[in-house]
Amino acid sequence: MITPKNNKIIHWFFHRYILRLIDKNFRSFNYNNIAVDADKSVLLIPNHFSWWDGFILYYLNYKLFKKRFHIMILEETVSKVFFLKYMGAFSISKNSKGLIESLNYAAELLNDPQNLVVIFPQGKLYSNFVQQVDFDKGILRVIDKTQQKTQLIFSATFIEYFEHKKPGVNVYVNKSAVNSFNNIHQLTEAYQQHYEAARQQQTQIVI
């Protein structure tokens, strides 16, 4: 497993790079404010639809959560893009041993209230406006190990152009009412309710 590395110079450079990348490529970046407990870490569960996802959530953390950013990414991606590990990325492998190691590492990170961890339970890329969201069950291992120490936050991101040359980003976030789920179906349903409400709100935008 590839874990995050510390290098202040590299981190500073690519922090500025990511912020500029978002500002340059999107005409707007909108999100709703929610109360965040400073004494608890954040487990952020988003939808997964594009190459931009990690950068968008990094930007969201910078603007809203203000925690130390970490994100679980496929091992081949972390290996290929050298700077990701300096920006909080850690790898996950699809083999069972590597999978458990990465999930346990995510749980360890969440023991620190200053940390935020992003996990994409969908596991694959889907359409930005897919109706039904399905999760892999591995995320439950992280939640079960950290439910008293972290706050579970759902996010749903939508990108649209309307009449503009550049698209706008809308991120809808909501804190889960509970941090314990008996099975993956309960977690998926809880996220689905947030996602559907966000999708309906997004599709009601008329220019």
For each feature predicted by the language model, list its residue ranges.
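Alpha-helical membrane-targeting segments
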Residues: 1-26, 79-87
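Non-catalytic C-terminal accessory region of glycerolipid acyltransferases
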Residues: 2, 103-207
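Soluble or luminal CAZymes and related metallo-dependent hydrolases
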Residues: 9-14, 97-102, 135
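Helix-to-loop junction immediately C-terminal to a conserved catalytic motif
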Residues: 12-48
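Short, flexible loop segments at the rims of nucleotide/cofactor-binding pockets, characterized by
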Residues: 18-25, 93-98, 129-131
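Glycine-rich, highly charged phosphate/nucleotide-binding loops
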Residues: 25-30, 97-105
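Catalytic core of membrane glycerolipid acyltransferases/transacylases, capturing the structured
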Residues: 40-96
